[in-house]
């Protein structure tokens, strides 16, 4: 009996499936772009395209290079504006879609956009946290940063909209950590380390739940 070569059809099938997946992702990106420009303006569309280009070009980079690219992108693309001036409320956590759309945001919006972009780039959730801190003089106010743990026992690196350079938390004596969280849990931060995990996790953070609900609608 003549043996059939099934390898070639399998390869073609895989290529076809990959092409369908790529086409679906492009269609979704086009839908998001159209939605963004309709809701905001053409400048919002330019920011969205630049964000997609950032993701495409950074996929194969080492993790610490991804941190630099993402940190620099949002620190340059978004201007700081308080929630009171931006949304007319004391505190509001914008989705990346809203942040890119308006091109303005406060410290939470910078940090959230960086966190979800790094997740999109494949950085594991256990290495990332959104960290509430107290920023000391000259700011003397509550502040949020995105932090990255190279290893479970190392000091986290701080991605901050106030300081352009990414530095270890041990070098940021101007920041006093309060608590941190990600998609997996919530921690009290008594020191510049991992902190003590809180029972109930992020289910205790109503703002986080609201943010995720709105992100589901944005599909971003």
Residue ranges and their predicted role:
Residues 22-220:
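A structural boundary/capping signal
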Residues 1-9:
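Bacterial N-terminal signal peptides that target proteins for export
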Residues 9-17:
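Bacterial N-terminal signal peptides
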Residues 5, 19-22:
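Intrinsic disorder/low-complexity detector
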């Amino acid at each position: 009996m003549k043996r059939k070569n099934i390898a070639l059809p399998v390869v073609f099938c895989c290529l076809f499936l990959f092409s369908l997946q790529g086409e679906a992702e492009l269609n979704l990106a086009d839908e998001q772009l159209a939605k963004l420009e309709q809701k905001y303006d053409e400048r919002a569309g330019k920011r969205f395209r630049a964000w997609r280009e950032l993701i495409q070009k950074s996929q194969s980079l080492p993790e610490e290079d991804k941190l630099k690219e993402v940190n620099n992108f949002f620190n340059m693309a978004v201007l700081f504006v308080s929630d009171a001036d931006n949304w007319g409320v004391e505190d509001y956590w914008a989705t990346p879609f809203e942040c890119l759309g308006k091109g303005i945001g406060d410290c939470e919006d910078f940090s959230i956009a960086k966190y979800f972009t790094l997740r999109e780039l494949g950085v594991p959730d256990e290495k990332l946290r959104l960290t509430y801190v107290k920023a000391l003089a000259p700011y003397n106010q509550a502040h949020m940063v995105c932090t990255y743990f190279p290893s479970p026992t190392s000091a986290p690196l701080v991605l901050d909209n106030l300081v352009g350079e990414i530095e270890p938390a041990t070098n940021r004596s101007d920041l006093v950590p309060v608590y941190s969280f990600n998609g997996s849990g919530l921690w009290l931060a008594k020191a510049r380390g991992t902190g003590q995990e809180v029972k109930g996790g992020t289910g205790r953070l109503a703002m986080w739940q609201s943010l995720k609900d709105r992100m589901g609608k944005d599909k971003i």
